[in-house]
Amino acid sequence: MRYTMEKLPSRDLWAVIDSVTRKPALVNDVPQIDLDLDDADDLTDLLNRLDREASTSAKH
């Protein structure tokens, strides 16, 4: 999977990380950091689903 979640050090917040760049994922040019657990989990699932769909459509 391209996108993963990482807990921010010393905080109860999360970031969604792009495994290609090893930086926070960008949505509308906004780094996806300081998210609560549920939001980070949902966003990670969504971004990975969109990435899979883009990869599949690029092959056809």
Task: Tell me the role of every PLM-derived stretch.
Residues 55-60:
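Low-complexity intrinsically disordered segments
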Residues 23-39:
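A short, exposed loop/beta-hairpin motif centered on an aromatic-Gly-Thr core
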Residues 1-23, 41-53:
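Short N-terminal "domain-start" leader segments
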